[in-house]
UniProtKB/Swiss-Prot annotation:
It comes from Rhizobium leguminosarum bv. trifolii (strain WSM2304). PROSITE patterns: CYS_MET_METAB_PP. This is Canavanine gamma-lyase. The modification N6-(pyridoxal phosphate)lysine is found at K214. Its EC number is 4.4.1.43.
Length: 401
């Protein structure tokens, strides 16, 4: 390994990269933190006719590229060990950018049968109805089913590393093999499993997508999305889906996410450790109908998760339900005094959201317990585990009093 140099990202360990990546000494002021550059236009050369007006590598117009988004892109590509990255205003914009860039009318896509609601609607309704792009929704825990779904026109396989919200774990190495045999791209939403915990590109995945709003920013105060992969693939995304469609991240959000990502390795260590403690408490609690978390031995993909994630942990997302009807779930949530009832995940504070049994697209493909009770999705934050457990126990006591 070369001597560490903060200007050479490949020479840095992950914690050092998280601190120094995307940060530059400002040449004008001498400030040792990259400033927020709130400009929509940048100075042109003497002869503008020499320019590529769609260039995304040098700042000219912030829809194409700006100083803060370039710094963030370089950092995220290095963190994921990819060649290049394209950042967007939201995670959904990043997902749409992949689909828009690489799919056309008549193409076929294989998608996980449990997936983020926006992805479900895109492939179940919008893309088939408006653009004649057909999708097959498949259990990503069943590789035989994935193979059987492949067609001559299959151009893309898309999955989440850990399904939202059921926590089913996809076998990424097996999917890489299937995609290569099919001549299809494999895109993976790794929002639940950010680096350094897991790097799908190292297994041969073509494109990795993150909602930067979640763990990578980690503070619940900025939105963004990113696609990371080879220079060739990311260039197409920038040229087609960024320059000509927009969805551009603001300089302020790019700066916030660059700053938030500094503490990512420290936050993940705390969140993953706390999640295992909380999950084991939930497993022991007889007032719950079910709990699902990859770190529990009875989870169907526990051994896959242990092997795939290299023993680094099992993430900080879980789902459970109180033994009762929907109003019982709502009463439980209302009795919590530390855990916050809100959407999103990966924040510094622990978040819980109650979703009814039929509350999301494709819910009929959820496990029977999810359909019967609905579910409470729990995103573990940075609080002390004993406080979270006490909060849950007290809320259960009040709910069943």
């Amino acid at each position: 390994m070369p001597n560490p140099d903060k200007h050479n990202f490949s020479s840095l360990s992950f914690g050092t990269l998280a601190v120094h990546g995307g940060n530059e000494i400002d040449k004008t002021s001498g400030a040792i933190r990259t400033p927020i550059v709130m400009a929509n236009s940048y100075s042109l050369p003497y002869d503008p006719s020499t320019m590529d007006w769609s260039d995304t590598e040098e700042p000219s117009y912030t829809r194409n590229s700006g100083h803060n988004q370039i710094c963030l892109q370089r950092k995220l590509a290095a963190m994921e060990r990819g060649e290049d990255a394209a950042v967007f205003a939201t995670g959904v914009a990043a997902l749409h950018a992949v689909f828009f860039t690489f799919l056309k009318s008549g193409d076929h896509v294989i998608v996980g049968d449990v997936t983020y609601e926006a992805v479900w609607r895109l492939f179940a309704e919008l893309l088939p109805e408006r653009y004649n792009i057909e999708a097959t929704f498949v259990d990503m825990g069943n590789m035989d089913a994935v193979r059987a779904a492949v067609r001559p026109k299959t151009k893309l396989i898309h999955t989440e590393t850990v399904a939202n919200p059921t926590t089913k774990v996809a076998d990424i190495a097996a999917l890489v093999s299937i995609a290569k045999d099919a001549g299809a791209l494999l895109s993976v939403d790794s929002t639940f499993t950010p680096p350094p915990f897991f790097r799908p590109l190292e297994l041969g995945v073509d494109l990795v997508i993150h909602s930067l709003t979640k763990y990578i920013n980690g503070h619940g105060d900025a939105m963004g999305g990113v696609v990371i992969g080879s220079k060739k693939l990311v260039h197409h995304i920038k040229a087609d889906a960024l320059v000509d469609l927009g969805g551009t991240i603001s300089p302020f959000n790019a700066w916030l996410i660059t700053r938030g990502s500094v503490t990512l390795p420290l936050r993940l260590k705390q969140q993953f450790s706390t999640a295992e403690i909380v999950a084991r408490y939930l497993e022991s609690e007889n007032r719950l109908a079910f709990v699902t978390y990859p770190g529990l031995e009875r989870h169907d993909q526990h051994h896959l998760a242990k092997a795939q994630f290299g023993g680094k942990g099992y993430g900080a997302m879980m789902a459970f339900a109180v033994d009762g009807d929907p109003d019982t779930q709502n009463r439980f949530v209302s009795n919590l005094k530390v855990i916050t009832s809100a959407v999103s995940l990966g924040h510094d504070e622990t978040l819980i959201v109650h979703v009814g049994g039929g509350g999301r697209g494709g819910a009929e493909r959820y496990p029977l317990n999810f359909q019967k009770y609905g579910h409470l999705r729990l995103s573990i934050g940075l609080e002390d585990p004993e406080d979270l457990i006490a909060d849950i126990k007290n809320a259960l006591d009040l709910t069943f009093a």
